[in-house]
Amino acid sequence: MKASILEKLEHLAERFTEVGALMGDPDVISNQDKFRDLGREYAELEPVIKCYNEYNTVLGNIAEAKVLISDSDPDMRAMGQDELKENEAALEPLELELQKLLLPKDPNDGKNVFLEIRAGTGGDEAAIFSGDLFRMYSRYAESKGWKVEIISENQGEHGGYKEIITRVVGQGVYSELKFESGAHRVQRVPETESQGRIHTSACTVAVMPEADEMAEVNINKADLRIDTFRASGAGGQHVNKTDSAIRLTHIPTGVVVECQDERSQHKNRAKAMSLLASRLSMAQEEKAAAEQASARKSLVGSGDRSERIRTYNFPQGRVTDHRINLTLYKLDEVMQGALGDVIQPLVNEYQADQLAALSE
């Protein structure tokens, strides 16, 4: 491993020890903000240092094995050869894991997200599939201990949603769901199809990290038009008799957001402002990324909503992610929320791209 990487790891190990000691300091414990920040740093460093300690242990074992190999006793030499082979085999995966752990972190990875699903081509069938995708993401979120809040919804005439916007809250939400932005295509026989013909429909998914503060995108209140209207209902549970729903229009960009989930106009306005800030922030990031884009396009997560990223073929029970040529014949499990088998290969490919870029 490169000397510069080992030097960085040694520095991180010293910092890990320092943070652990600080968290036991009564003055730090009494300062909730400081204690929380240190706790977050400790949690981020812990997997790196654990892997680094394992790496050092294996290096020590290799050194001991080499001593045994030079022993005059044949049995000791044979034992040394076995230990050397075993530990050298363990060293390479640990080096790779350490390099992955040291990759630059996406500053948005720890953020909550706004997840938007919209029916595209396919009419009623596309709206029904939007509902299927919403349930798939909701079940995956539940398995991860995340919370899903509906911000606004426009239900389809025969089920599902023409559009549904949700907020997903939890640890590391964006780090996993950021790969879901794009066009999702479904191939199946609709219930209303008497000839048994397969229809193709599509939905678009957009995943945006929640903006920390409105200041991030400098929203000027003079640039906002605020309209109130009567909510059609929150999650289908009640009909609001007051004009508590909020529609915000950002005049310079034309971006419009709505929130009608809460009974309180104040709460709806706060959620709508958060969604607006996130959309504007994402637009700024996409513009900057486009300006700085390299000639080599990343295989994973361009985030273009028109880019077809995945196909769900029901007759074949198949899910195909077109970005990495991944095909799984476990459609039922995926639609029930077992998204990990799709997301993890995308994460692996993304990290491989980062490692390749570092070595260039």
From Swiss-Prot:
Could you tell me which InterPro entries the record lists for this protein? Answer: PCRF, Pep_chain_release_fac_I, Pep_chain_release_fac_I_sf, Prokaryotic/Mito_RF, RF-1
Q: Mind telling me how this protein is modified after translation? A: Methylated by PrmC. Methylation increases the termination efficiency of RF1.
Q: Which GO terms describe its cellular component?
A: cytoplasm
> Where does this polypeptide localize?
Cytoplasm
Q: Which Pfam families match?
A: PCRF (PF03462), RF-1 (PF00472)
Against Gene3D superfamilies, the record matches this protein to:
3.30.160.20, 3.30.70.1660, 6.10.140.1950
- Which positions carry N5-methylglutamine? Q237
Q: Which GO terms describe its molecular function?
A: translation release factor activity, codon specific
Q: Please classify the protein's predominant subcellular localization into one broad category.
A: cytoplasm
Sorted keywords for this record are:
Cytoplasm, Methylation, Protein biosynthesis
Its biological purpose is as follows: Peptide chain release factor 1 directs the termination of translation in response to the peptide chain termination codons UAG and UAA.
UniProt record similarity statement: Belongs to the prokaryotic/mitochondrial release factor family.
The record's HAMAP family line, in alphabetical order, gives: Rel_fac_1 (MF_00093)
Q: What is this protein called?
A: Peptide chain release factor 1
**Organism encoding this protein:** Saccharophagus degradans (strain 2-40 / ATCC 43961 / DSM 17024)
| Primary gene name | prfA
